[in-house]
């Protein structure tokens, strides 16, 4: 029986204007939602996946939603707070252990990594090189320094290291040198200024992506501590999962996916034996992998080109005696 028949209210998932998020069907299949379960959406965004979970929860089920972005939390409070099954927390999923509501354990956890479409589409958020706006890039605009503050402050070497480490940008040193030379004349304040500068110093090639793509990605990841938060969030999620609970993670670039894949493999598979080392304690797996890398179907890609780089990985926490 669906929630509306049991709780007397129409769930937010019934809104006809809702656009399905990336890998919607695959996420719900991966989480394997049970009616009375407790689930955490650690990256609420605009609530697309959360709506799907709610359609499969009964009146005793619970959905906990988190997001760093105050605009996302405002949407959650507007559209989801009236539902008694929903609890809302503003913060990074790396902080989920600090939320008392997670202490009872979770039957499923979802992380949909990276920047959301609303963040990219609104120029004032400062994430997009294609739309001029303040050079900000913070997912939580009330916390930390903006991209402009960082890029106008740090040394050339740090800029180059960030572009290489988080963007795998081969021209990182050339771009960093140009950034420092430009800011000595006039500090950066707009996304268009940075994007145009990067484009002006990049060698012409056959690459179809915008010249600033990797640099903007790298700066955004650094400003928001995305990879550090991911590592902490994975640990916290597994700690809170009940035996049999599932962890589903959507990543959008190789750096994220590599961390997720290696983390799940490390908890699911015994490391190779090394005869040079003393015999180790017997490996006890914590997770079981549920399939491999899951990608968007051709049908979804036709409707949503942004899904082309999305990769979903799912793992299940083992029973204590498994």
Swiss-Prot record:
Residues annotated as binding S-adenosyl-L-methionine: 47-49, 67, 93, 112, 119
Statement: the UniProt record of this protein carries the keyword Ribosomal protein: no
GO molecular function, one term: rRNA (cytosine-N4-)-methyltransferase activity
EC nos: 2.1.1.199
EC primary class: transferase
Coiled coil region boundaries: none
Official protein name in the record: Ribosomal RNA small subunit methyltransferase H
Gene that this polypeptide is encoded by: rsmH
């Amino acid at each position: 029986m669906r929630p509306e028949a049991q709780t007397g209210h129409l769930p937010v998932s019934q809104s006809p204007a809702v656009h399905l998020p990336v890998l919607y069907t695959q996420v719900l299949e991966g989480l394997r939602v049970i009616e009375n379960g407790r689930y955490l959406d650690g990256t609420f965004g605009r609530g697309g996946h959360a709506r799907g979970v709610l359609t499969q929860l009964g009146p005793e089920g619970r959905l906990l939603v988190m997001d760093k972005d105050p605009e996302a939390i405002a949407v959650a409070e507007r559209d989801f707070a009236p539902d008694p099954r929903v609890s809302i927390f503003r913060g990074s999923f790396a902080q989920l252990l600090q939320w008392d509501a997670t202490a009872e354990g979770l039957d499923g956890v979802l992380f949909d990594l990276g920047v959301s479409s609303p963040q990219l589409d609104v120029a004032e958020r400062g994430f997009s090189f294609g739309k001029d706006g303040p050079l900000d890039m913070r997912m939580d605009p009330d916390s930390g320094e903006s991209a402009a503050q960082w890029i106008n402050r740090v040394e050339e070497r740090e800029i180059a290291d960030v572009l290489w480490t988080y963007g795998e940008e081969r021209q990182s040193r050339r771009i960093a040198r140009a950034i420092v030379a430009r800011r000595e004349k006039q500090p950066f304040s707009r996304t268009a200024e940075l994007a145009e500068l990067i484009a002006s110093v990049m060698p012409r090639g056959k690459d179809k992506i915008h010249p600033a793509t990797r640099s903007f990605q790298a700066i955004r990841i650094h400003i928001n501590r995305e990879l550090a938060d991911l590592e902490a969030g994975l640990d916290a999620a597994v700690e809170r999962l009940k035996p049999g609970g599932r962890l589903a993670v959507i990543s959008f670039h190789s750096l994220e996916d590599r961390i997720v894949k290696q983390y799940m493999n490390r908890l699911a598979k015994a490391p190779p034996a090394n005869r040079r080392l003393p015999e180790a304690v017997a490996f006890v797996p914590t997770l079981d992998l549920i399939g491999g890398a899951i990608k968007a179907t051709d049908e979804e890609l036709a409707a949503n080109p942004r899904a082309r780089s999305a990769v979903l990985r799912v793992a299940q926490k083992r029973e204590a005696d498994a």
